[in-house]
Structure formats: C-alpha cells, structure tokens
Amino acid sequence: SIHNIVQGNTIIANRHPEKMDYIVSNPPFKLDFSEWRDRVESLPEVSERFFAGVPKVPAKSKDKMAIYELFVQHIIYSLKPDGQAAVVLPTGFITAQSGIDKAIRQHLVDHQMLAGVVSMPSNIFATTGTNVSILFIDKKNKDDVVLIDASNLGTKVKEGKNQKTVLSPEEEQKIVETFIKKEAVEDFSVTVSYEDIKEKNYSLSAGQY
C-alpha cells in the first residue's frame, strides 16, 4: 500500500536483504553518485554484491557515472538460486570489451545464469536517444541462450517534440514467441551456447553470431 512506500537508497541501504524469485527493473543509466561512491566500496558485502567492481569517479562529467552497473550487480546478488530477472540496460552493455560491463557479462556466462537479450529499436523511449536492450537473467538456465535483434522493428511516431518508436502488437508477439521458443530466425535471432558466447569474447549481440 501507499503507506509502505519509502524513499531511500537501495545501493547503500538495502531494505530487502531477503532473496527474490523475480525482479523487473529499469534502473537509471547515468547519475552522479560521487558523494557516496566510497561508501559503496566500504560495505561489508561489497566483494560478493558488487563482484565486478564499483565505477570510479571521473575527473569530469560526473553526471555520466554508470550507476546501472551497480544496479545490475545488486539484482544478480538479490536473486534466489533459481531466480529470474529482466533488466533494461543501455545497449552498449552487451558488447563492451572491457571494464565492469564485460566483467558482469562474463559472470553471467561463466556461472550459467543467462536466458537471453533483446536489443530494442532506437527511440523506444521518447525522452532519450539511448539505445536499450533487455537483459534476461535466469539462474537455472544451463541450456542455450537466445539473442534477439529487434532494432529494425517498430514505427516512428512523434510524441510532443520527440520521436518515438512504437511496436505493433504483432511485433511484440513475434519477440515474445521467438524468445520463449528459442527460435533462430534469419536477420532477427540466434540461439547460442555458453561456449559460443565465450568464443565471441562474451558479446551478447545477435549480430555478432
């Protein structure tokens, strides 16, 4: 209920230490957290909870600190051994060849807890031009992983001063059915093994397979 809503900082004061069955999240991508960044690194559970590291404070553009890297690690940490999650992330996350992004992907693959990735069309959010992908985590999936490139789907529409891409119900259904069935569709999706992903330097981009 509304009385149970509390404003706080999940990263430095986790009010839900119990493990979760399911998590759905659209975390902030970039945010200046330089004032409390060192507090994160001093948390007693930091090595387990933030296994891939805590972003450094840059000399400039502190407002572009990649706070999503903290949230996705927190989500992985918060899942039960058979838990599942869906997380909206900047598409750059799925191909970054170094740093925390790659370390997170490597953790997901090496520990076999990945269901798949759907790369969405540009401007799927009207208020930002950042391309996004949806990362699906499944701690019990030891089989193939499905990677979908949905970037060419959708229709461009104007929303106020901004342009937005809108998926039709049929396109949404195509994504859902392809993902659930783990289908390989030419120029749209691939199914890959964890070993395949390792050979591609842990890339989660369908276009690289």
Q: What would you call each of these model-derived segments?
A:
Residues 1-17:
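S-adenosyl-L-methionine
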Residues 13-209:
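A conserved structural/catalytic subdomain of Rossmann-like adenosyl-cofactor enzymes
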